[in-house]
Regions:
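Juxtamembrane helix-loop-helix connectors linking adjacent transmembrane helices
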Residues: 1-48, 64-72
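Transmembrane helix-loop-helix hairpins at the membrane interface
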Residues: 37-143
Length: 143
């Protein structure tokens, strides 16, 4: 089971890299800061796990529940939960002292990536979403 999950996470990460490359045709991608390999590896694993817990495992169901209580149909609540959690996921990358300077390219890509991970979470579950997020971060940050 774990080997299958690992392969699937790698597959989804490669798909998201392809989306990033496609978007890169329209906007140049800023280069990241140089750090040690091990510290970047740990940071990428941690970011994938932490962000998926916060934005998909906790926020998405909370948004869907709240919207359903306000009268939204289950389908509409799910769609708006994906949209809202993706928007907040993107915004969160620009907040605080370690936040990035706002850039339309990275904002758009992070919003799309948030939607990508949200759909993965809804269809395949937390493990695949978190693993794919960590694998994507490692692919673009270490390779």
């Amino acid at each position: 089971v774990l080997m299958g999950m690992l392969v699937e996470c790698g597959f989804w990460a490669v798909i998201l890299v392809g989306i990033a490359r496609l978007q890169d045709r329209f906007w140049p991608l800023a280069a990241g800061a140089a750090e040690g390999f091990l510290s970047r590896f740990v940071a990428f694993c941690g970011a994938g796990l932490y962000e998926e817990v916060l934005f998909r495992l906790l926020l998405m169901p909370a948004l869907a529940w709240g919207l359903a209580r306000l009268g939204a149909t289950p389908a509409a609540a799910a769609v708006w939960a994906v949209f809202g959690s993706s928007l907040l996921f993107s915004i969160a990358h620009y907040v605080g002292p370690l936040g990035d300077a706002f850039d339309p390219y990275s904002f758009t890509f992070r919003f799309l990536a948030g939607g990508f991970f949200a759909v993965l979470f809804a269809i395949r579950g937390f493990g695949i979403a978190a693993g794919s997020h960590a694998a994507y971060d490692m692919l673009v940050g270490l390779v």
